[in-house]
Amino acid sequence: MIYNLELEKQLLAGLLKDPEGFAEISNFIDTSDFYSENSPLNSTIFRIIQQATNGGDEVDEIIIAQRVNEVGLSFEDNLNPSDYIKSLTLRKVPAGNILKTAKELKKYSIRREILRSSQDIAKKMKSITPDASYRNIVESADSIYNSRINLYELGHDAPQNIYE
């Protein structure tokens, strides 16, 4: 599985209830960690919480819902963003659970990146000429894989001890 919408909802619920928890995850979680093929709602809510937190604004469910509505996105099943955000605030979220949930969510994001890398490698392998050297073939695959995956090892936003 490459996404978990329940984890996304749990993280958003935690941030709505405890916006100070954003500081714990801001160095390794961003909007791209939210699966948005079905609906951009969760990533949009996260981005608005992120903007409010970074701007020193209060994170209030009414204000967040208003800002989501102002974005003007259409959501599947005619979902009302205000009702959805209200449902998030009603979720039970254990105290101090934001960091743990964010680390679990990051695992899904990494899986999606690995999947995308493998798809890009497959495309590249199909386009390499038959007379290409072994070295060229391997280096082509390596460059695609490493350009995405090394981010998690070496990048400034790499989470610490994600698998603990």
Where are these regions (language model features)?
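The Walker A/P-loop phosphate-binding site
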Residues: 13, 154-164
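Noncatalytic partner-interaction/assembly domains of nucleic-acid and motor enzyme complexes
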Residues: 1-108
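Non-catalytic interaction/clamp surfaces of large macromolecular machines
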Residues: 114-119, 123-153
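A sequence-level detector of short, solvent-exposed, charge-rich linear segments
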Residues: 30, 64, 68, 120-124, ...
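Sparse recognition of residues in long alpha-helices and their boundaries
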Residues: 27, 61, 117-118, 130, ...
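Generic detector of ordered secondary-structure context
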Residues: 3, 93, 106, 133, ...
